Amino acid sequence: MFAFDPYSPAVDADPFPYYRRLRDEHPCFWSPEAQMWVLSRYADIVSAGQDWQTYSSASGNLMTELPGRAGATLGSSDPPKHDRLRGLIQHAFMKRNLLALEEPIRAIAQQVFGPLKGAQQFDFKDVSSQFTVKVLMAALGLPTGNEALVDEQTVRDNAVLMVQSDARTRAKGPEHIAAYNWMQDYAGKVIAMRRAEPRDDLISHFSLAEVDGDRLDDREVLLTTTTLIMAGVESLGGFMMMFAYNLATFDEARRAVVANPALLTDAVEESLRFNTSAQRFRRRLMKDVTLHGQTMKEGDFVCLAYGSGNRDERQYPDPDRYDIARKPRGHLGFGGGVHACLGTAIARLAVKIAFEEFHKVVPDYRRVADQLAWMPSSTFRSPLVLDLAVQ
C-alpha cells in the first residue's frame, strides 16, 4: 500500500520516486500522517496557486507554520490584503535599484570564494551561507561593521532554525519558536534604526513605502522584514546549495558553464526546475472540491508539491534529466500564482554572480559523499553538508 508523508525524513532525502507514484497513481492523495491532501501534477498545482478564493493561504503557507504569522504576511494572506501588501512591498523593491546591487554582490562573492584557491576539499555550505547572509544584509540594509547588532552567523543560524522542524516530531519545537522570537526582536531594532535614519535599502523603503496614502503598519513592517530575512537566507542559501549539488553531480553541465559563463542563466533556471529548494507549501480549502475522483472538504489542508510539478512529464519531456539547454518556462522553483516570490530578480542575479566568481577559483569539483544528510524541513530541501573535492 502506497504511503506519502511529507514530513518524513525519507521524503527529505529523495522525494522524487514518491512524487512519480503520486502523479501517476494518486494525483489527489490524502496523507493520513500529515492530515492533508497532496497535489502533485503541474497543472493542478498551477491551477490551485491561481485560485486563491478556493485554495487559501490565510491559515499559513508553510508546512509547519510559525505562531502569529498566518494571515499577516505576504505569503500567508489572500487578496485583497495580499494585493495591498504586495503593492507596498513591490514599491519598496522597485526603489531599490537592482543594478546598484551588482557591484557589491560581486565584491562579496570575491571576498567569500577567493580564499578557496588552493583548497583540496571544503564544505560548500560554509561559503554559501557566508555569501547569502552578506548579500541579504546588503540588499535589506541590515547593519554591518561597526553598526552591527549581532554577528552574521547568529542571523543565519536563527533564520535556518525558523524554517526547520523537529527531526522526530516534524513540528516546530521550542528552539524554532525561540529563533522566530529572536528574529522579530532583531528586525524590530533594525527597523527603528532605519526609521530614525533612512537609507537606500529595502528596510528603509518598507518602513516608508506609501501608495495612494496607504502605508504598512508597524506589525506589517516587522513581519515582512522577519519573513524576508528567513526566506532570504533559506531560499537563496538553499538554492545555492542545490545548484552546487547539481553541478557537482553532472560533469557535462559543470564543464559547459565553466567554459561559457553565459550559460549560467539557463543553468540556474533548469536547477530551479530540476531540484528547487522550495519543495512544498500549504493551502486551506474554502469550499469542497472534487478532483481526480476525490472530494476534498472545506477546511481541509492541501499540500502543493512544487518539486513534483517541476518533474511532471505532462509538462516537461524527460523531466528527470538535468538539461541546461531546456529553458523550462513556467517552472515552479519560485512558486507561482498570486504568491510567486517577489525576490526572484535579486536571487537570480546573486546566484549567477556567485558561480561566476566561484568557478574562477574552483572550476572543477565533485561531491565527496553519495549519501547526504538533509535539512529537517517539509517546506524547503537542501543538504546539511555538501563536501566538495577539488579536481
State where each predicted segment sits:
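Cytochrome P450
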Residues: 1-391
